[in-house]
Curated annotation (Swiss-Prot):
The gene is cmk. Belongs to the cytidylate kinase family. Type 1 subfamily. Its EC number is 2.7.4.25. SUPFAM superfamilies: P-loop containing nucleoside triphosphate hydrolases (SSF52540). Its main location: cytoplasm. This is Cytidylate kinase.
Amino acid sequence: MYFQIAIDGPSSSGKSSVAKTVARQLGFEYFSTGKMYRAFAYVMQVNRLDVNLLLKVINQINWRFEHEKVFYNNADISEVILNQEIAQLASNLATNPEVRKMAVLRQQALAKNTNIVMDGRDIGTVVLKDAQLKYFLDAKPEIRAQRRAQDLGIAYDSDKAFQELVAEIKHRDAVDTSRTADPLVQAPDAIYIDSSNLTFQQVVELMVQQARTVFKL
């Protein structure tokens, strides 16, 4: 039997960093579904494709996802796809039902025959519906804005600038929870964690301990 851990949550909730660390401590594979949408966005951008063309050529594209890396035509694009322009395009793509359907099939294939920790916005509800452990990792928008600013190395010199970031996060939440294709929602059997007052390490330790208990590791 293979073990699956699904971690969902809104943007900047820390789910990718937590999921990656949990996977390493358990010796599991790790995959962030956000990387797949970013890879789609990157391919669209460099080849000047629209969504319809992307859907037509998707099976002909030479890319692979392995060991937390993303490769396109054998080139590592893991860092390139982190830029804000790609992120915005990926966010728009993720609202397209056909793109999501295509992505989910690939994500499910990646999770076969391996122990895995996967994070995203529809893992516990769509991608890995039968995962033995599911989490919904959340935090207050203001806390998530602070964490994103730290991750990006941005020091806000005014409250107005910071509030704009908070507003951006709230807007992203609204988009994610209201889209027609696989909206962001907590799975009924997911464990809810509000990390607003928890450290990164506390969240990781909680998940690792529960996984070792449930999976008898």
